[in-house]
């Protein structure tokens, strides 16, 4: 011991407390070391913790009534001592005390806990109702993938989520909500209701809300299902050499927004590519598309991933996309190298010459097709090497074919035997590279026969693959299968790309990374309701979707449509919305249905009896030129059939699955979705003179004024400026003076509320008009 340390010890011994500690306490006690350790930074935290937890009483209790509830011992196990902890002045206790407290300790007020910790209770519910299968032992091929750690109530970007949380917890301090926040008003309202009156600190509420709204994703080794309901139990489901079969219970919370978003984007692109300016139309439709109650743009910004279609629409709307390249089903991420494109005329195997952009330069890519992953090395018109992992035969085959085509290998061009004239769903001829892709996916033997074979590698972890996708002593030239795992490539970085008029995405380097031809041709049913608020899109949907969109549009524009009808404007039937609806009416019946519907509506107008629900129901059928019987009478129908059969029909005199109306509640049900007509049906609807409808936007201001000249027609009335007066014939030819209103008021207000006043005005003038 050095002299300096002896001097230091003498100083310490002058302090009575330190003197007692140094003489009576063993030096291996963790708490003493902690108390007198001069260094603030722990050199080995893990070892320190293990050391502490090995001692009998590593924990300290705070003083107070709660601490006194823990007994000194329970069933022979010592829980705490009367010894005082030097650091906290509390009692020393064992780790068994924690178990005792959790099991036998007092239970406080838990009201509201289920609402606040909803995500944890839902997790417990899924676990309680789960089905567990057998455990299998053996090698488990786990691949690192970017996965969502827990199911979400509704995924949104972190900054958007923080605004929503502020709006839920601190509405007064949050200020005026942004549009991106107000999109989630239903969620905000629901959460405010749920959390009202809970005595839990706001910071805890904010943390739990963040857990429900903000995605936490990690790259984890996974075998099998990757949805969040499985990932939250991943530690129980698989290891290096075992797997446990598991099916979560309850309702799956996995986002159906993502699936619906993909369906919507694919349909928008399919519709846009036939337009003269695909980009312009895609942007127009995307901005008018709503999934459930949320705009598509908001979904695309909030949700991670999707497919090619989603990235194209993201780019069209000015959002960033993940760094990746697509060639049909093939997904690529550049590892090294750079290519330069030159247009060349290539003689292909069927004897035709195709003008194709050929890429020059050595390049290496990480590639993926379905569950099959690999590394591709290519040079000009040559596939040098393709290393892939074992997967489903279909995915392996598609990956090999797509890499051969993408590499633009001369053997691939020579393998074409038949015609290449494939069309996309819009009936357009595909470009040469996509023609070749489609051709060889359908006729793989032509490619493999031309490609050639070589001896399989001798390395133990590699094997060859033949044309049947089986392991073999000989292999397709340059193609090798590895027994090792090739991890899924990460694409967390985002980048801003430019988009061409024809929906091709281009990087700053000029490289085309994907386009409309890469969008899947698959069609599926959206799990959530998609509303395209533009008739240009409706014909792409199912019969039910088109019916729903058309009637929603009619309801939205009901006041204008009703006024135009009552004014006798026959061209009102020629709306774009009804043109789309015509596509689901059987072609032979369209003219007959139109003649019938127009006749019924005209009869309502002539007899001065308006039924709003009947008006809404029949209006879309009036688009086609009317077809009448030889005697000039319209055909008669009780049921109007639509394409698709089954429940796709509308009953004229009663309700049907597509369209029904309850006059008591004034609720219209279209394809199962309820819409209110309250405020849109006037009290006098069954007994109204049509003459009043002419006065929509006008006030009766007195008796006929000779100075104003002759009686005006409807067309002349419409041309009047606000404040101008004119004479008209009201009711059954009664002459009155009207003035055009200076302010634009709702037509429905004039049509309904003004009727009684106008009628009384005219009747009070009866002596002057007789």
Curated annotation (Swiss-Prot):
Belongs to the influenza viruses PB2 family. A motif (Nuclear localization signal) lies at residues 740-743. Its main location: virion. It is found in: Virion; Host nucleus. One of its GO terms (cellular component) is virion component. It holds the Pfam family Flu_PB2_6th. This is Polymerase basic protein 2. It comes from the Viruses. It comes from Influenza B virus (strain B/Lee/1940). InterPro entries: Flu_PB2_2nd (IPR049110), Flu_PB2_6th (IPR049114), Flu_PB2_C (IPR049115), Flu_PB2_CAP-bd (IPR048298), Flu_PB2_middle (IPR049111), Flu_PB2_N (IPR049106), INV_PB2 (IPR001591), PB2_helical (IPR049113). Keywords: Cap snatching, Eukaryotic host gene expression shutoff by virus, Eukaryotic host transcription shutoff by virus, Host gene expression shutoff by virus, Host nucleus, Host-virus interaction, Inhibition of host RNA polymerase II by virus, mRNA capping, mRNA processing, Viral transcription, Virion. One of its GO terms (molecular function) is RNA binding. One of its GO terms (biological process) is cap snatching. Plays an essential role in transcription initiation and cap-stealing mechanism, in which cellular capped pre-mRNAs are used to generate primers for viral transcription. Recognizes and binds a wide range of cap structures of target pre-RNAs which are subsequently cleaved after 10-13 nucleotides by the viral protein PA. Plays a role in the initiation of the viral genome replication and modulates the activity of the ribonucleoprotein (RNP) complex.
